[in-house]
Amino acid sequence: VLFRSLAPDTGGAGRRRGGMGAEVALTISIPQAEALVMTHGLEVPNSVGLSGGQPGGVIAQSLAKDFLAHAGDRPAVRPLDADDHRDFAPLGPKPGAFPMTSADVFAVTWQGGGGIGDPLDRDPDDVVADVRRGVVSRHAAETDYGVVLRAEVSAAGFARSPST
C-alpha cells in the first residue's frame, strides 16, 4: 500500500453530510502479475441520500502504468491530487484481468454515505469546518451547499451565495 486516506467530496451533501469514502493506492511486490478487479457502485452510487440529501460518490478505479519508474522525487502517491491524477487512466466498471508490474500503481476511491436533508440547510459554519478539515472542497462548498468562501477560511469566513 502506497497511500490510504479518507477521500474529500465522497460523502453525499446534506444538512447532515454523509460519511467520507476512502482512497487507496497500491502496487505489487513482485515483478509482474495479472490483476482482477470487480466492483459494484462504479456507475451508480449505492448509498442514496434521504429527505433531499445527495447520494455518496461513486467508486473510481484507475491504473497508472510505470508510474513509479518515472515518479522521481514526486510526493506520496495520492490519486485525487491534480498533479498526479493525469497519470491515472480510468479502468471502468468491469475491466477484466489486466497485467501489472511493480512500477504500476492501482488506485481506488470508494463511495461514502448519502447525505440527509437539504444541503442548503447545513450550517455554513459546519461547511467551513468541513473545508478546513479537507472533508469538502471549496468547489463543493459553493456548488452543493451554496457557501462561498473568502480567500482566507476562518470560522466566520463565509458568505451564502446570492441564490440562497
Where are these regions (language model features)?
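Glycine/proline-enriched, intrinsically flexible loops and inter-domain linkers
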Residues: 1-164
